[in-house]
UniProtKB/Swiss-Prot annotation:
Keywords: Cell inner membrane, Cell membrane, Heme biosynthesis, Membrane, Transferase, Transmembrane, Transmembrane helix. It comes from Coxiella burnetii (strain RSA 493 / Nine Mile phase I). CDD domains: PT_UbiA_Cox10. The gene is cyoE. It holds the Pfam family UbiA. Belongs to the UbiA prenyltransferase family. Protoheme IX farnesyltransferase subfamily. It is a multi-pass membrane protein. It is found in: Cell inner membrane. The chain crosses the membrane at residues 28-48, 52-72, 102-122, 123-143, 150-170, 176-196, 221-241, 243-263, 282-302. One of its GO terms (biological process) is heme O biosynthetic process. This is Protoheme IX farnesyltransferase. Its main location: membrane. It catalyses: heme b + (2E,6E)-farnesyl diphosphate + H2O = Fe(II)-heme o + diphosphate. Converts heme B (protoheme IX) to heme O by substitution of the vinyl group on carbon 2 of heme B porphyrin ring with a hydroxyethyl farnesyl side group. Its EC number is 2.5.1.141.
Amino acid sequence: MRTRTEIVSTTQTSATWRDYFQLCKPRVVLLMLLTAIVGMCLASPGIVSWRVFLFGNLGIALAASSAAAINHLLEHHLDKLMRRTYRRPIVQGKINRKNAAIFAAILCILSMIILIAFVNLLTALLTFITLIGYAGFYTLYLKHATPQNIVIGGLAGAAPPLLGWVAVTGHIDPPALILLLIIFLWTPPHFWALAIHRIDDYAKANIPMLPNTHGIIYTKINILLYTLLLTAISFLPFVIMTSGWIYFSSVCLLNLGFLYWAIRLLTSQRKEIPMRTFQYSIWYLMLLFTALLVDHYVYLALKLY
């Protein structure tokens, strides 16, 4: 019987638009766009200009998709070893590496043209730095160099709300940095929970994730510590009056949920808990940024009436 790797290496099929769409990691990009949109809306005292909203999000989405495609391209040899990633289009032979590289380059160029022409130069520059940071520094070096890869590399993934803010204002302000910091602190418990669930995959691919290098208990303790730190920092938008009581009450509930899962992860040996913690973390970030958005426009509406 042939192994999965042998089956993957001999499979050759033609690419469809769905394969290129998968190359872009659309679910990840959608979550990033949500945070970028919130950054835009919080930066605006009213309704965001349609021009900035449309072209800003389009440019950010194209850059994020380009970074995702580059990640697929550079890690195809590792993806075939991992259960979570072995069905990706390059691994399956649906898209060859040359076409993937061309596709990623086109997305990157289009992103820069759109952001420079229709938004502002600073947004384009920060977006490009983020792309290079993730696709280059993180994927090529950091991911394989240290178990703190997620912590350091998380800065690139945390950038979208800052990019959205700068798209509206043209400059960097403290509230935007707080939004970035929230995602930055959310990233380690999010990915380490997945890394515990997929510990065997990362071992096969020889990627030094924290559970593989320091053990599962050490990782669970770090997840709880980062969750506590995230809990504290998540109140800053309320403290500096960027948001109001709707956000405050929402984030209280969300933090209680995250702390519950972090503590349960630490105290339980059940195999499904790491994945359930990972899944909750996604809902946490989505709902936190949604609460910021709802809070902003409810209080804006109250001021008008």
